[in-house]
């Protein structure tokens, strides 16, 4: 569901100063708000969890809340403002910037700020973890979480997102399989898998990579996508399907939609939500229908 926003005149910018990129681009973001004639108040986070406290305490005073940090900062603010508060605008201040890339928000704040201020308000489902935290894009177990965990820190500092490409390459070559016990709305499915994604969005990376057909973010459902390649050839075929958005019958792909999910694995596997690492499985996930309101570029204006 998209709603045309009212004029945004006053915003709160929550900045994570631990984000190296966020520190570097903050002056550009502030200039973009100033050039747009928007009053912007900045509050810096001081510890993990502080962004949620800031949002809960101050959001009601503003027309919109913007985040400038990593995907963890976005998760905190979305969790704090679920079903309430003003819309959230995401500025890419981290390394992976999964949410910004998926929403097709430019990484340059000089472009992102005016596009979001003149864009749409999108009311969408959010995913909810067992501890109450929300996510916008999806939860992954296995290959994608390993890709994030194995990206070398020194390369992330130097090369940013490209460090994850190296982590992904290493994870694909290893192709660590696990026994998956997936419960969807009370029904149990068991498979051997290399990765499972519980997705709210059907495509990521500026719509470059898709997970499956019919995955939308405002239908009150999440979508489990299980990937089970037996060889490097299988993995390459799946990747080609994801790039072409061609999801015909494939023995290495398995899909189930639902509202409540339980992921159990043998052995325990690392997990991630919107690019942020989580404790190892088991993991519980559910949908929170139409819980989030985000600012997105108006279609056709991301360039």
What residue ranges belong to the model's regions?
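ATP/NTP phosphate-donor binding region
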Residues: 1-65, 301-303
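ATP/nucleoside-binding phosphotransfer catalytic cores, i.e., glycine-rich phosphate-binding loops
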Residues: 45, 184, 216, 226-303
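Catalytic core of DAGKc-family lipid kinases
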Residues: 5, 14, 24, 32, ...
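A generic structural signal for short beta-strands and their flanking turns/coil linkers
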Residues: 176-178, 192-194, 218-223, 257-261
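N-terminal glycine-rich "phosphate-gripper" loop used for MgATP/nucleotide binding
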Residues: 67-72
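Glycine-rich phosphate/pyrophosphate-binding beta-alpha loops
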Residues: 140, 197-213, 277
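Short Gly/Thr/Asp-enriched flexible loops that form oxyanion-binding sites at enzyme active sites
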Residues: 73-84
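Gly/Ser/Thr-rich active-site loops/lids in small-molecule metabolic enzymes
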Residues: 155-162, 204-207, 213-233
């Amino acid at each position: 569901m998209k709603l045309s926003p009212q004029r945004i005149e006053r915003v709160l910018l929550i900045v994570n100063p631990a984000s190296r990129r966020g520190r570097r681009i903050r002056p550009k973001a502030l200039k973009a708000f100033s050039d747009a004639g928007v009053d912007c108040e900045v509050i810096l986070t001081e510890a993990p969890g502080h962004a949620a406290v800031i949002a809960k305490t101050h959001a009601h005073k503003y027309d919109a809340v913007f985040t400038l940090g990593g995907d963890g900062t976005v998760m905190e603010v979305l969790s704090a403002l679920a079903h309430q508060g003003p819309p959230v605008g995401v500025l890419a201040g981290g390394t992976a910037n999964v949410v910004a890339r998926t929403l097709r928000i430019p990484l340059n704040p000089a472009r992102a700020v005016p596009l979001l201020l003149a864009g749409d308000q999108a009311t969408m489902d959010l995913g909810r973890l067992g501890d109450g935290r929300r996510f916008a894009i999806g939860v992954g177990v296995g290959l994608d979480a390993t890709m994030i965990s194995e990206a070398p820190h020194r390369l992330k500092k130097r090369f940013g997102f490209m460090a994850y490409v190296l982590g992904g390459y290493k994870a694909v070559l290893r192709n660590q399989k696990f026994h998956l016990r997936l419960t969807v709305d009370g029904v149990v499915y068991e498979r051997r898998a290399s990765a499972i994604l519980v997705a709210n969005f059907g495509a990521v990376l500026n719509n470059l990579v898709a997970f499956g057909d019919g995955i939308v973010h405002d239908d009150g459902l999440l979508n489990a996508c299980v990937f089970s390649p037996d060889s490097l050839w299988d993995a390459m075929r799946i990747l080609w399907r994801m790039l072409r958005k061609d999801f015909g019958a494939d023995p290495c792909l398995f899909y189930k939609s639902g509202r409540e999910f339980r992921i159990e694995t043998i052995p325990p596997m690392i997990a991630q939500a919107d690019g942020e690492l989580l404790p190892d499985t088991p993991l519980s996930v559910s949908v929170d229908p139409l819980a989030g309101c985000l600012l997105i570029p108006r279609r056709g204006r991301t360039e």
